[in-house]
Amino acid sequence: AAAAPLPNHAAPRGKAGLEGFDGLAEALGGTVLGQPDYLQKLVIALKRPYVMGHEGESARNAFLVTGPADTGKHLSLCAAAEELARRGVFVSGDISWMDLSLYPTAAEEKLFLQDLYMALAAKGDIVVFEHYERCQPAFLTVLSNLVQRGKSPLAGRYVLQNGRLVDAGNALVTDAVGALTPRGKYLVLLSEAPVAKLADSFGAPFVSALGDICETAALTPESLSAVAKAEFDKLAARAQKALGFTVTAGDAALLLAAESSGRAKGAQGVLAFWDRAYRALAQYRLEHDDAPKAAALGAADGRLTADFGAGPADLLSLLPEAYQGEVEAVKAELD
């Protein structure tokens, strides 16, 4: 029997339209700190099909998100999807993620196609492809076809079975699937590599076919300070609720947190800093029957201190020895 594209329609749209994007960049800026220019470009990429028009099962838009590590690429996409779902533009805040490094050789072809179909068939509006640099080149051709042609023919004979794409082999079938389509989803390539690397892997016509290129910037000291304060506020709220005492942080503690990113200038070091701090505060609570009234965080000799009422002391010394070893290893990397 003649093969046909996937027997489905484009993913349903939310009821809201272009007006649902009003003030979106500013709203995202409350979650993704220090990236105002990037957020403007991201909003434009998401808004583009609502201005330019889009119909059918081709990609609603295809774009690249790139930039240094730990600068908000994943966070911004998640925050945008959730906010657009809340506003009624998207039907779901979910995102489908595909790690292309899981398919390094031709032997993973069936797995790749099955996973790709599941990602395209999921209820979210966005499909993100990561680590294209480590993917089998033949599979990148499939993605290139989805972006440039709106569909990608399947070389083998496949059928849908219980919602999954299955190789039909030599079996006699009447409903073979002949091609994959983007189903009206946003297709996003996410990478730390520059645009030139994308052209090397996919070719210049593919890059030209992308609707937008959104690039994050390395976080400035001011941005890292803002991240440090925002993450501390989360820690303080969590400690008040779970540990039963108030936590404050002086300027020295906040500066130490902001500088914990090291040379990478990403937010991950700051997040890890406050994660260790919370673990140490929790350890103090575990070791004492009565909760202190408050804990005041400070810094001395490059170490985070806490004053529970008897004077400042090294907070991270409360961590179990194995965990302290991990802390020292992280510090050595940052130095």
Which sequence ranges carry the predicted segments?
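C-terminal engagement/docking regions of AAA+ P-loop ATPases
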Residues: 3-11, 52-55, 69-78, 267-335
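Conserved C-terminal "switch" segment of AAA+ ATPases
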Residues: 10-17, 31-32, 83-93, 121, ...
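Pre-Walker A (pre-P-loop) alpha-helix and adjacent loop at the N terminus of AAA/AAA+ ATPase modules
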Residues: 18-61, 277-286
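Conserved AAA+/SF3 P-loop NTPase catalytic/coupling segment centered on the Walker-B
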Residues: 76-77, 109, 120-164, 197-209, ...
